[in-house]
């Protein structure tokens, strides 16, 4: 039995204790049903799909942890995103092809000196829907320009509208869980990509909880001198405390996520 969309429409980080109680009761019922069917020699397994944030709340609110086995769908690997796009593109090809061949059939493989697919993935919050939205925007631009394939210029143009989409969506998600200061994003308009903790706190009107939420949603990442690349919440399983630890010791700076830079006209 597969159960999905239970948490559809629930705000990010906004599930109530009543919501979690419903989930606990459901899982308890599936275990009971499994035991009853097994006594009749009927094989039965139930798989419940939950968002990461809802699962974390469920674990925190469950006293008897460990009864259910969690399988994490790993979306922090670019190879998984290649598979998503390949499955959608390969059906249009006459011959079986590798991902690179399939991608090359519909788009330029380079943006300047950079791999074009990696460029798109880096501008997502590592969610499949982000990548598919970006690709759709690229297709729209290519079609409007009369191109048979997506060019690198099409991708750069599509990034403008995609970045606006991401900014608005994240703004709506933040409003669902934090109405006290729900529109902080435009305070970062025109800011540098790399920004000190003091400046972030100033732009957030001194609201430390808001800063934590901006990190949790992936709007802000953290860059330490010892690291080549900044890290974002989805790369540490949304462990915000771990990300913020070097910032609080003045050993790191904040970074605006690439998905939002075009919309906010960031510099640097």
Task: Go through each PLM region and give its residues.
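C-terminal leucine-rich, beta-strand-based interaction scaffolds used for sensing/assembly
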Residues: 111-141, 146-268
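The catalytic "switch" region of P-loop NTPases
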Residues: 6-113
């Amino acid at each position: 039995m597969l159960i999905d969309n239970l948490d559809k429409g629930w705000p990010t980080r906004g599930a109530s204790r009543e919501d979690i109680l419903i989930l606990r009761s459901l899982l308890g019922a599936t275990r009971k049903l499994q035991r009853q069917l097994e006594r009749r020699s009927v094989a039965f397994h139930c798989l419940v799909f939950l968002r990461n944030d809802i699962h974390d709340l469920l674990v925190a609110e469950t006293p008897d942890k460990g009864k259910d086995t969690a399988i994490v769908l790993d979306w922090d690997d670019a190879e998984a995103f290649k598979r998503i796009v390949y499955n959608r593109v390969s059906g249009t090809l006459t011959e079986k092809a590798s991902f690179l061949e399939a991608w090359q059939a519909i788009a330029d493989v380079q943006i300047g000196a950079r791999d074009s697919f990696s460029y798109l993935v880096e501008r997502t919050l590592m969610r499949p829907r982000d990548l598919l939205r970006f690709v759709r925007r690229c297709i729209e631009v290519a079609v409007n320009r009369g191109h048979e394939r997506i060019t690198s210029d099409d991708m750069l143009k599509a990034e403008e509208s995609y970045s606006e989409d991401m900014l608005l969506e994240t703004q709506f998600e933040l409003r669902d869980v934090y109405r006290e200061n729900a529109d902080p994003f435009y305070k970062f308009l025109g800011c540098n990509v790399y920004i000190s903790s003091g400046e972030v706190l100033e732009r957030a009107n001194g609201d430390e909880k808001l800063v934590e939420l901006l990190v949790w949603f992936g709007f802000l990442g953290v860059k330490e001198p010892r690291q080549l690349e900044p890290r974002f919440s989805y790369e540490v399983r949304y462990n915000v405390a771990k990300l913020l630890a070097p910032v609080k010791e003045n050993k790191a700076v904040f970074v605006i996520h690439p998905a939002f830079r075009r919309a906010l006209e960031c510099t640097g």
